[in-house]
């Protein structure tokens, strides 16, 4: 009888312990990603410390700057060449939602900027996966049509 009580006690406590540890991981991952977004534009060296050595970034969509980058090219090319060229006055990022589940974190963000061809106020879904308390995978989803027309002087043409 005593064995059964201990067995059921363990059976009852184990799932809640596992669930609590899952929440700790999610909270920890949110802190990493919060710090990344707090620093990426103003203090990129701090943000880059939060990126895993095997990092992969992809600006999703079909556009001139929609490409894949690794840790080195994310900093040297994306942050130091691509973004300054198309957003010479910078961009303001307003976080609207934060979602974490397991090793994944998703932020939705509203951007406000003037692109080289006019107002560029795009909405983003930033999908990140973490490993060893660092960001290892990052896909940035946005309106590639808006990116093309405001950042690259492309025009929409009627086909009629």
List each language-model region with its residue ranges.
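Residues that line or immediately flank small-molecule/substrate-binding pockets and catalytic motifs
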Residues: 8-11, 54, 58-59, 102, ...
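A beta-strand edge to alpha-helix "cap/lid" segment located at domain peripheries
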Residues: 20-24, 41, 79-160
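N-terminal/domain-start segments enriched in small and hydrophobic, helix-friendly residues
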Residues: 29-30, 36-43, 55-57, 63, ...
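A solvent-exposed, acidic/Ser-Thr-rich amphipathic alpha-helical stretch
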Residues: 52-100
